[in-house]
Design a protein with these regions (language model features):
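N-terminal subdomain of nucleotide-sugar transferases
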Residues: 1-49
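Conserved donor-binding/catalytic core segment of Leloir-type glycosyltransferases
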Residues: 4, 196-199, 203, 208-222
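A short, charged, and often flexible helix/loop element on the N-terminal side
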Residues: 44, 49-84, 128-129
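A short beta-strand/loop micro-motif in the catalytic core of glycosyltransferases
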Residues: 90-91, 147-156
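Short His-centered aromatic/hydrophobic patch
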Residues: 92-97, 116
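Nucleotide-sugar donor phosphate/pyrophosphate-binding loop at the beta->alpha transition
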Residues: 111-113, 121-143, 160
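Carbohydrate-associated surface elements
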Residues: 157, 180
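Acidic anion/phosphate-binding donor-loop and adjacent secondary structure
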Residues: 163, 181-203
């Protein structure tokens, strides 16, 4: 099975949670499927971070260099959609990539799944900042959610937000899949040097190593 992931962020260009999410998702899917990644940010140089097998990076189209940023995004989306032929499923992340996933699904008659990391209707302040660009991003996101075969929400709260923002979406198509943690990256340090570094780090942060520690990984919001 071939799965094409479509994303704005991918190494070395990660600046938020969505990029971390896609990077880790690609890692765990590769042993299970033929995974292709279509990412913004231009081609990755061989041997550098993000230049994994099956990764294609796309630069903004030079013809749209002076256009609104949302139109530049759509230009990349169109190019990505045209390169998803042969995929069995496309999976997009954030509004930047949602239109590419939506169009690729229509063009190739394959399911388009999207993961909700944020929602444009819940960011009305962007209208003042981006003007017409916000209208375009909202339109693209709405089209993608309306046509998606499935929508993944990272929590029950996000699922409620999706259904409130896009009431036209069938609730049966919105599934909750909580974010996970790769526990291999969370283990007791081994060796004298690692133990010394761990002790120094705890001391620097004011953490008492004799007391139990709970680690929270997530977003703190009101």
């Amino acid at each position: 099975m071939r799965v094409d992931l479509i994303t704005k962020e991918y190494p070395p260009f990660i600046y938020g949670g969505a990029g971390v999410h896609v990077n880790e998702l690609a890692k765990v899917l590769r042993p299970l499927a033929d995974v292709r990644v279509h990412a913004f940010g231009g081609p990755r140089e061989p041997g550098t971070e993000g230049a994994d097998p099956g990764v294609t990076g796309y630069a903004n189209l030079p013809e749209l260099a002076e256009a609104n940023a949302a139109l530049q995004t759509f230009g990349v989306d169109l190019e990505i959609a045209g390169n998803c032929a042969g995929a069995d499923l496309v999976h997009s992340h954030t509004w930047y990539a949602n239109l590419a996933g939506h169009l690729a699904g229509l063009l190739n008659d394959i399911p388009h799944v999207l993961s909700a990391h944020s929602l444009e209707p819940m960011r009305p302040w962007k209208a003042e900042q981006l003007g017409g660009g916000y209208a375009l991003s909202s339109w693209a996101e709405g089209q993608a959610y309306s046509g998606a075969a499935a929508v993944i929400a990272v929590s029950g709260g996000m699922r409620e937000d999706i259904l409130r923002s896009y009431p036209q979406v069938d609730p049966e198509r919105v599934k909750v899949v909580h974010n996970g943690i790769d526990l291999s990256g969370w283990r007791r340090p081994e060796g004298e040097a690692a133990a010394e570094l761990s002790e120094a780090t705890l001391k620097r942060l004011g953490i008492d190593p004799t007391r139990p520690t709970v680690v929270f990984v997530g977003r703190i919001t009101r």
